[in-house]
C-alpha cells in the first residue's frame, strides 16, 4: 500500500509540473494533425512523456540516420482523419532501410517493395476479385478509403530494427488504439504478428472486429494462423457492409 501511495503521489506531482498546451501548440511541437490531437485529448502527463520521446529521437538524429524523416513521422495522421477510420492495420516500426513513409507497411513510391508487403499483395490477389499487385509500395490511397496504417513505434535508426522500442512511442500509439476503440463503433482491427496481437487488450471486441494472423513476412512460418489464406481483407469488408458502412476499395492502389 505504501508503494502504491508513493506512485500515486509521484504521478500527481509530475502532473502538476506538466505544461498545458493548446492543440495548435501540440501540432507545432509534435507535427501531428490537429484533428487527431482534438480527438485524442492528450493529458498533460502524456504531452510531457511525448516531449521526452521527441528529445530522445532528436538526440539520435543529431548523429545517426533515423527513419522516416521528421516531416513523415506522422504522415498517417494527415492521410486518414479519425472520423474517416474504418479499418486499422497495426504495424511494428518503420522499415529500417529508409523505405518507410510514415504508414505501417507502406513505402515511398521510388523504393522497391519489401517482402512483407509483397505477401500482403499476394493475399489480396488471392482473395479480392480483380486485385492486381501494383508496381510500388505506396499505400496512400488506402488511407483515403478509411484505412489507418499505424505503427506502434514511429521511428527507427537505420539498419537497427526496433531500436526506438524503449523510447516511449507507445504513449501515443496505445492512446490512438484505445481511443478509437472507445469512441468509434464497428471498426476492423487487423493484427498481424505477435507484436500486433499483444495489443488486442486495448480493443473492445464486443463492438469491433479483431482479426489476427501471423506476420506477413515470408520469414514467419505459422501453421496455426498463416497470413496467406487469412481472408482478412474480405472479412473486413463483409463486417463493414453488415454494419452499414461502405467497404474498402482495396483495388484503389491501381486506380
UniProtKB/Swiss-Prot annotation:
One Pfam match: UDG
Annotated GO CC locations: host cell nucleus
First-listed, main subcellular location of the protein, grouped into a coarse class: host cell
Biological-process GO terms, alphabetical: base-excision repair, AP site formation via deaminated base removal
Lipid metabolism keyword on record: no
InterPro entries, sorted: UDG_fam1, Ura-DNA_Glyclase_AS, Uracil-DNA_glycosylase-like, Uracil-DNA_glycosylase-like_sf
EC nos: 3.2.2.27
Keywords: DNA damage, DNA repair, Host nucleus, Hydrolase
Residue positions of the active site: 93
CDD domains named in the record: UDG-F1-like
Molecular function per GO: uracil DNA N-glycosylase activity
Top-level EC class as recorded in UniProt: hydrolase
Keyword DNA repair: yes
UniProt catalytic activity: Hydrolyzes single-stranded DNA or mismatched double-stranded DNA and polynucleotides, releasing free uracil
Subcellular location: Host nucleus
Extent of the signal sequence: none
Function: Excises uracil residues from the DNA which can arise as a result of misincorporation of dUMP residues by DNA polymerase or deamination of cytosines. Therefore may reduce deleterious uracil incorporation into the viral genome, particularly in terminally differentiated cells which lack DNA repair enzymes.
Similarity remark: Belongs to the uracil-DNA glycosylase (UDG) superfamily. UNG family.
Protein name, entry field: Uracil-DNA glycosylase
Source organism phylogeny: Viruses, Duplodnaviria, Heunggongvirae, Peploviricota, Herviviricetes
